[in-house]
């Protein structure tokens, strides 16, 4: 019985059928102006001409525009003829098809273009037990936030859970309630009057209680944030400033009236600068260029006119309200909108808008020419969208007021009460949706209204934040059912945040469209059993919101389902134009230059960010240590021919040139292990055969440079498309593991130098000694050293020597406190371990600080960007304060060659025989493969689609720069540098850009990488200047740099699918994450794929760690062939999920053919919306009127045309299917 009663209450007095159209409101004044319309004009005015939406494919669908009823008037007989032509409104079997049709239509105006929505729900309640007021109880930007019952605070954002019953009740409300679409009103008073008039006319509301309902609707709105701002000093803030950050740029240009038209109205209308120029009392102005206007009326297409009060459309104006006139507002010129001026009052903020600087002179001149003076009379401060410019220009457009100056909450904007922190989270151009629900004692049955305003209007005081209101939902009912009304309000608010219903609400033409949107939403709803889920539990927002595109894709024209249910995958990383073979000499290089040249200046402008400074400091510290370490190892291997200073100079020179001119400046160059192995083998060969090492190395380097340039000329970089994820991840994982291994190895190596004494006897600590003594069996080298220093063993006071002096004279340490390399050094090793792991964990913690709950967002973001640099500074300071002598970074202090016998220019021949110039081509071939593979695999990893790079890649240009600088370094006797995988990945990770404007509860979206050249350029410039910064760099402990290596290696492993698949070996199936490839590939095949990849990784590790490391690039190349063999064990569908499909020449041709056919199909559909053009033989073109096409969801469109072949006078038939 209770349910029946509730249903009876929901049923209005005057029932209406579901086929009845919603009221398309023509504005407040349409009911008051005595304008007579013919019956046929009224019918044609409401007619909507629907173009049939014919889907050709999922990617490209022809959309027919709705013809606006304002411009096309047709008689009823025209509609009958349309039916005879076969242009019928399509029938839809499901709400989903109806919704897809609605979303597939486009409108000529901007009033139905969807915007982001902020939804607020207010409930009518008592305040202090005395009077009613609307109190904000919930809001939605992306997820729901509620005002907590027990405290004045907002809840955490959560996923809204709705009861199914409330959704059905909402559907009943839309079905039986008042629906008014495209209402033109400027104040809440006008909206209330029009809604109530419609309710009375339809019998939903009794005229006797009209004033009671109107009074309830116009009650004050109390927002949650107002208490926090009561004690704050009012802010003096201009609308222009607000508009820069939070308003829609299209708001100024809505319906064809742009900023230029507004400036024209400034010049021809009233002069807004009079006040400031004449020095009058400060007043608050709203200029015409902030007022969105509607279409029509004027030659420019705008309808912003100076309203003229008439007895028919406005009550008596208050003394404080006057209208502003100018000479330009009388005849045919566009009339300036009425500008209302507020008095100098304390409770209204002063908002002063200054005209653009370029218009000041024009305004001054116009002011002198004006013959009529404009009088400014204090009045109400109108909101930007509540001015009468929103009303129809063909009708009266008077600001609604009353004797007391109108409703203040609807006419003033107090920015001192605006929560600007929340305002920043609202996207640009957002509009508001207000939900008003409540219970009153004078109603016997609920009244419901759904209103869509056109255009959106800023109703001050109605919404928590000053954004224009687009939708209003009203539900007032008798007392006793407040929870029911609350749930219905939550339902409509949640629906407005749904991506599909949100678009339907903007594009709906009648009530049925809204009902279809609700039905489609119900089709997608998941119901949880009440006994298995507690609805009071708040669901945390997901990290990533699933895409709703599948709900927008219509079924195939013949009603069949797609062949595969697999979700669409993004294009492979090698599908871009950068790796397509041109067939011309240096063709790929020329295209790279053309592609990157337009971005050259922006590569420097885009670096104006604090994030780039953090990246420079981080990567500088990260690059310094491996370069110096590599130089030291190279110095040991070549007996000082090439050492640390050459390594620093070579890295700086190569890095600067590469950062300036390379195709992908995000890549960081560095030294590699195979290059070091090659240098060792080459030096040993030259020493055994008495050849000049530097000269032979120069010859090999020049040959390598030449061969790399040949690869550039022949577009060999296009072969990179055969390097799939399988090869990339094996190579990247190996480099990351090497970084981790070498960081730990260096830490253990410190244990050999700074050994610690084990198994100590604490009682015998006072007897532990370690002194220097004469070596018992001095070597020949030691004797020669003594002779050079003119000393003998007997003349040296061994017991009095310091540790360094004892090592200089090759003394021997004797005593119980002595280790293998000297006395035990207390605490150094353990302190190094503390520095090492503290650096790693602190860097990781600070990098993730962006997601913590402490401090403002800007502070967290800055700490995250400077994470590694802050860690280094903190650890250096702690090390300095503790004072334990940990090993420090050693940088050469002089800029000169390590070997005094060599210079900065090396001859390719030198003392070597002439034939060495020719034989050098053989090892150069091996070096070419090494350089090519290292460079291009790293480039492929950097240019992956996951990084969302927008400026394109430049594989050919990258290889050219590496080749040129390799030749330069060879001539100068400097080490060779190539792309460093881990450093490049760390560089990219440090420049990730995420969305700043995110709704509460929504995770920031990854937008891409800050692509620029400055970070790499500054890193290598600082590296070259390091020789002059030794006084600062000498304080950096080496364990801290080793900890940075560990952090880079571990952080670079994130996102590698290979390691995610390795984790699956130890997980039961029920605990495995919902990885996409596990849905489509059997688990045992995933394990087989992982085992093969792991085996290849182990083989690469063994080869790289052995003396055969010089053939390491050949083994990386072999991975491509291993991947090709996997086609025999896996299907292409499985490999498409586990890896990228290998490119095939036949597949490319077929793909090109499909693309060409698609372009042809799109070209056929170009032109006006009433004709389809089909090419025919001998250049003929068939034109088919769209109205002859009949669409049925069960079968494809088929058109048969008879036409005459002119030359042969024969009749032919042509048939096409769409």
UniProtKB/Swiss-Prot annotation:
N-glycosylated. A motif (PDZ-binding) lies at residues 1215-1218. Interacts with USH1C. Forms a complex with ATP6V1B1 and NHERF1/EBP50. Interacts in a pH dependent-manner with CA2/carbonic anhydrase 2. Interacts with CFTR probably through NHERF1/EBP50. The lineage of its organism: Eukaryota, Metazoa, Chordata, Craniata, Vertebrata. This is Sodium bicarbonate cotransporter 3. It comes from Rattus norvegicus (Rat). Expressed in aorta, ventricles, atrium, mesenteric artery, kidney, spleen, duodenum, jejunum, ileum, colon, lung, trachea, gastric fundus and pylorus, cerebrum, cerebellum, pancreas, liver, parotid gland, and epididymis. Expressed in the inner ear by cochlear outer and inner hair cells (at protein level). Highly expressed in testis and spleen. Residues 78-90, 567-576, 1148-1165 have a biased composition (Basic and acidic residues). Disulfide bonds join 770-772, 806-818. Residues 319-337 have a biased composition (Low complexity). It comes from the Eukaryota. The PDZ-binding motif mediates interaction with the CFTR, NHERF1/EBP50 complex and probably with USH1C.
């Amino acid at each position: 019985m209770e349910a029946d009663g509730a249903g009876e209450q929901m049923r209005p007095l005057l029932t209406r059928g579901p086929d009845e159209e919603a009221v398309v409101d023509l504005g407040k004044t349409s009911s008051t102006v005595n304008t007579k319309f013919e019956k046929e004009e009224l019918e044609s005015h409401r007619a909507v001409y629907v173009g049939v939406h014919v889907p050709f494919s999922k990617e490209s669908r022809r959309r027919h525009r709705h013809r606006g009823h304002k411009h096309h008037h047709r008689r009823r007989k025209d509609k009958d003829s349309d039916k005879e032509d076969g242009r019928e409104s399509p029938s839809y079997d499901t709400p989903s098809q109806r919704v897809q049709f609605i979303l597939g239509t486009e409108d000529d105006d901007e009033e139905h273009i969807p915007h982001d929505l902020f939804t607020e729900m207010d409930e009518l309640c008592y305040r202090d037990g005395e009077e009613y007021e609307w109190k904000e109880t919930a809001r939605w930007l992306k997820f729901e936030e509620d005002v907590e019952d027990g405290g004045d605070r907002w809840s955490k954002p959560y996923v809204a859970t709705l009861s199914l019953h409330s959704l059905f009740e909402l559907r009943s409300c839309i079905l039986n309630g008042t629906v008014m679409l495209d209402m033109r009103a400027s104040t809440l008073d006008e909206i209330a009057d029009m809604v109530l008039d419609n309710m009375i006319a339809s019998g939903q509301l009794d005229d006797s209680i009209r004033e009671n309902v109107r009074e309830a609707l116009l009650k004050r709105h109390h927002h949650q944030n107002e208490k926090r701002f009561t004690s704050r000093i009012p802010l003096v803030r201009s609308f222009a400033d607000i508009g820069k950050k939070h308003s829609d740029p299209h708001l100024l240009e809505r319906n064809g009236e742009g900023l230029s038209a507004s400036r024209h109205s400034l010049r021809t209308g009233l002069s807004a600068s009079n006040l400031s120029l004449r020095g009058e009392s400060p007043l608050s102005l709203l200029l015409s260029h902030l007022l969105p206007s509607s279409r029509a009326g004027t030659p420019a297409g705008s309808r912003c006119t100076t309203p003229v009060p008439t007895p028919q459309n406005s009550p008596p104006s208050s003394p404080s309200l006057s209208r502003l006139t100018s000479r330009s507002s009388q005849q045919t010129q566009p009339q300036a909108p009425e500008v209302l001026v507020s008095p100098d009052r304390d409770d209204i903020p002063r908002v002063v808008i200054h005209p653009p600087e370029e218009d000041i002179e024009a305004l001054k001149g116009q002011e002198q020419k004006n013959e009529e003076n404009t009088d400014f009379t204090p009045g109400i401060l109108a909101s930007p969208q509540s001015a009468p410019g929103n009303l129809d220009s063909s009708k009266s457009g008077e600001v609604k007021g009353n004797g007391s100056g109108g409703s203040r909450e609807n006419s003033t904007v107090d920015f001192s009460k605006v929560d600007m922190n929340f305002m920043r989270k609202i996207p640009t151009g957002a509009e508001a949706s207000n939900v008003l629900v409540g219970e009153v004692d004078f109603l016997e049955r609920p009244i419901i209204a759904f209103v869509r305003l056109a255009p959106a209007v800023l109703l001050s005081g109605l919404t928590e934040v000053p954004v224009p209101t687009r939708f209003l939902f009203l539900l007032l009912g008798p007392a006793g059912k407040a929870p029911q009304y609350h749930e219905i309000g939550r339902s409509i608010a949640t629906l407005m945040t749904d991506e599909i219903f949100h678009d339907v609400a903007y594009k709906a033409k009648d009530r049925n469209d809204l009902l279809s949107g609700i039905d489609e939403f119900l089709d997608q709803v998941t119901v949880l059993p009440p006994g298995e889920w507690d609805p009071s539990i708040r669901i945390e927002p997901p990290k990533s919101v699933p895409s709703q595109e599948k709900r927008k894709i219509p079924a195939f024209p013949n009603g069949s389902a797609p062949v595969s249910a697999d979700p669409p995958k993004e294009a492979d990383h090698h599908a871009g134009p950068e790796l397509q073979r041109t067939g011309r000499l240096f063709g790929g290089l020329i295209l790279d230059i053309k592609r990157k040249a337009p971005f050259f200046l922006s590569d420097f402008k885009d670096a104006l960010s604090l994030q780039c400074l953090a990246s420079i400091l981080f990567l500088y510290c990260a690059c310094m240590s491996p370069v110096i370490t590599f130089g030291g190892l190279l110095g040991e291997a070549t007996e000082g021919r090439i050492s640390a200073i050459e390594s620093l100079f070579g890295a700086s020179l190569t890095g600067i040139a590469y950062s300036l001119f390379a195709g992908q400046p995000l890549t960081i160059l560095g030294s590699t292990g195979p290059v070091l192995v090659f240098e060792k083998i080459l030096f040993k060969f030259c020493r055994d055969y008495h050849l000049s090492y530097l000269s032979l190395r120069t010859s090999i380097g020049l040959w390598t440079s030449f061969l790399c340039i040949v690869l550039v000329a022949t577009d060999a970089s296009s072969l990179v498309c055969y390097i799939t994820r399988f090869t990339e991840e094996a190579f990247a994982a190996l480099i990351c593991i090497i970084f981790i291994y070498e960081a730990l190895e260096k830490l253990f190596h410190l244990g050999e130098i700074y050994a610690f004494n084990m198994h100590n006897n604490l009682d015998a600590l006072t007897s532990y000694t370690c002194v220097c003594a004469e070596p018992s069996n001095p070597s020949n080298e030691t004797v020669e050293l003594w002779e050079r220093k003119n000393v003998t063993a007997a003349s040296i006071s061994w017991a009095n020597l310091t540790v360094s002096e004892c090592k200089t004279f090759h003394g021997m340490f004797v005593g119980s406190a002595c280790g293998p390399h000297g006395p035990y050094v207390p605490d150094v090793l353990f302190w190094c371990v503390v520095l090492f792991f503290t650096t790693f964990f602190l860097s990781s913690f600070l990098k993730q600080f962006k997601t913590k709950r402490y401090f403002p967002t800007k502070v967290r973001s800055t700490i995250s960007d400077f994470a590694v640099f802050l860690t280094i500074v903190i650890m250096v300071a702690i090390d300095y304060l503790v004072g334990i002598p940990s090993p420090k970074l050693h940088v050469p202090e002089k800029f000169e060659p390590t070997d005094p016998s060599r210079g900065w220019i090396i001859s390719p021949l030198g003392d070597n025989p002439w034939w060495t110039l020719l034989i050098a081509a053989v090892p150069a071939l091996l070096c070419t493969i090494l350089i090519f593979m290292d460079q291009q695999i790293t480039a492929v990893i950097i240019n992956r689609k996951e990084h969302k790079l927008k400026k394109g890649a430049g594989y050919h240009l990258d290889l050219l720069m590496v080749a040129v600088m390799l030749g330069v370094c060879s001539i100068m006797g400097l080490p060779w540098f190539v792309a460093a995988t881990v450093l490049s990945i760390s560089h990219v990770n440090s420049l990730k850009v995420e969305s700043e404007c995110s709704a509460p509860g929504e995770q920031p979206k990854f937008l891409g990488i800050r692509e620029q050249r400055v970070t790499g350029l500054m890193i290598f410039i600082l590296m070259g200047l390091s020789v002059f910064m030794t006084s600062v760099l000498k304080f950096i402990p080496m364990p801290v740099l080793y900890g940075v290596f560990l952090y880079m290696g571990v952080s670079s492993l994130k996102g590698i699918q290979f390691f995610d698949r390795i984790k699956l070996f130890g997980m039961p199936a029920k605990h495995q994450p919902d990885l996409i490839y596990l849905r489509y590939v059997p688990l045992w095949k995933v394990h087989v794929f992982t085992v093969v990849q792991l085996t290849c990784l182990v083989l690469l590790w063994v080869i790289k760690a052995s003396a055969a490391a010089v053939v390491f690039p050949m083994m990386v190349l072999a991975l491509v062939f291993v991947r090709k063999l996997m086609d025999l064990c896996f299907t292409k569908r499985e490999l498409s999920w586990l890896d990228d499909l290998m490119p095939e020449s036949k597949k490319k041709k077929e793909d090109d053919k499909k693309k060409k056919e698609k372009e042809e199909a799109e070209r056929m559909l170009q032109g006006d919306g009433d004709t389809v053009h089909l090419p025919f033989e001998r250049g003929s073109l068939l034109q088919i009127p769209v109205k002859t096409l009949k669409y049925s969801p069960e079968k494809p469109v088929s058109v048969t045309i008879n036409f005459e072949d002119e030359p042969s006078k024969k009749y032919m038939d042509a048939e096409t299917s769409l």
